[in-house]
Amino acid sequence: MAQTSKYKRVVLKLSGEALAGDKGFGINPIIIKSVAQQVAEVAKMDCEIAVIVGGGNIWRGKTGSDLGMDRGTADYMGMLATVMNALALQDSLEQLECDTRVLTSIEMKQVAEPYIRRRAIRHLEKKRVVIFAAGIGNPYFSTDTTAALRAAEVEADVILMGKNNVDGVYSADPKVDKNAVKYEHLTHIQMLQEGLQVMDSTASSFCMDNNIPLNVFSIMEEGNIKRAVMGEKIGTLITK
């Protein structure tokens, strides 16, 4: 019998760095296997799950732009990096016999399906894990914004933000400020007004306008994805 989850449908946002582990670059096989096991465990519950991965472990568009590259070109390279991460995660999930589909905003039919909203929803209804890659297909938009947009499009109940270096939202960087306070609950407007670096302001505003809650937690602790889906109080919950 499937375990009961708090949410019917969730979007899990993973930074590229979360897949790199301590090295901060590339794909750590141990980390991606752990993430895949956690996602597969959720997929067996009565919860539909879509995943969005960043590409910062391979390439950051902003870094390229800062070094003098054309911003559009640099961002498209970042989108391709997310596809590499998505395929790696898909492979790990399928090794666990978890039915998975990668949908990309930039068509590359030899390796993934093109993103079509109704197709994505149908895959979720069939209890397949859906991995969204290549951002929204346009430069200047982050994968945080992708997570917000896709969550709205597939009518997800919540965005789960798995972080690799922090276990929630703090008033300041806990690595720098020993007096930093961890929030258990925030509103979207608080997050924007206080300049808390949970996600970029475009994504934050979109979540606020569309009443999409966020749960920010550490991805590095085994079982946290399931705990979040079950409704356990972990990390920081951000609501309207």
Swiss-Prot record:
Name the positions where UMP binds.
55, 75, 136-143
Q: Molecular function terms in GO for this entry?
A: ATP binding; UMP kinase activity
UniProt keyword annotation of Cytoplasm present: yes
Q: Which GO terms describe its biological process?
A: 'de novo' CTP biosynthetic process; UDP biosynthetic process
Q: What class of enzyme is it?
A: transferase
Q: Where is this region: Involved in allosteric activation by GTP?
A: 21-26
Question: So what EC number does this one have?
Answer: 2.7.4.22
Where does it localize?
A: Cytoplasm
**How is the enzymatic or functional activity of this protein modulated?**
Allosterically activated by GTP. Inhibited by UTP.
Provide the residue positions that the database annotates as binding ATP: 13-16, 56, 60, 164, 170, 173
* Gene3D superfamilies for the chain: Acetylglutamate kinase-like
Q: In which pathway does it act?
A: Pyrimidine metabolism; CTP biosynthesis via de novo pathway; UDP from UMP (UMPK route): step 1/1
CDD domains per the UniProt record, alphabetical: AAK_UMPK-PyrH-Ec (cd04254)
UniProt entry tagged with the keyword Transferase: yes
GO CC annotation: cytoplasm
Q: Which residues form a coiled coil?
A: none
* Subunit architecture: Homohexamer.
Among HAMAP family, the record links this protein to: PyrH_B
Task: Spell out the NCBIfam families in the cross-references.
Answer: pyrH_bact
Name assigned to this protein? Uridylate kinase
The record lists the organism as: Staphylococcus haemolyticus (strain JCSC1435)
